[in-house]
Amino acid sequence: MYLIWIIGGGQKDLTNKILDEIKKLYEQLDEIKDKNINSSNVQLNEFMRQNVNMLKELNQKIDKYLENNNEILKEMEKYVKEDIEHKNRMERKLKQISMLLLIVIIAIGLTISYMVILNNEYLSTQLFNYIQIAIQYLKSLLSNY
């Protein structure tokens, strides 16, 4: 201020006018700063709104993805249960076939024994008929397997 007074030749009015102009410039600068800050705040708010909207969309997509995954998992669980049931049925059939095969082998052995030892044709024929029935049943089980 002293410098301005010296430059102005000590004219107080002129110095005051210059100081007023400088003051106005500072006020304008403050207004510009405020506008920039407000503009920045508006831009920041808009950016934040966009981010919130993007996050909402992403959350919805994730929810849909999780729903689809849950449906897929339920479907897979259903197939796994069916596979386990099928496996259990096959195991039971294999056990039945094994037991029937064992019975057929024993029956064949008994038939041969009766034929050789007792020479009883009627008993041998009956056992042979039972063996044929067991073999047919065994074939039907194997064809279903």
Curated annotation (Swiss-Prot):
Superkingdom of origin: Archaea
Membrane topology label: Single-pass membrane protein
Major site of localization recorded for this protein: membrane
Keyword terms, alphabetized: Membrane, Transmembrane, Transmembrane helix
Compartments where located: Membrane
GO CC annotation terms, alphabetical: membrane
TM region(s), chain numbering: 97-117
Name of the protein described by the UniProt record: Uncharacterized protein MJ1417.1
Natural source organism: Methanocaldococcus jannaschii (strain ATCC 43067 / DSM 2661 / JAL-1 / JCM 10045 / NBRC 100440) (Methanococcus jannaschii)
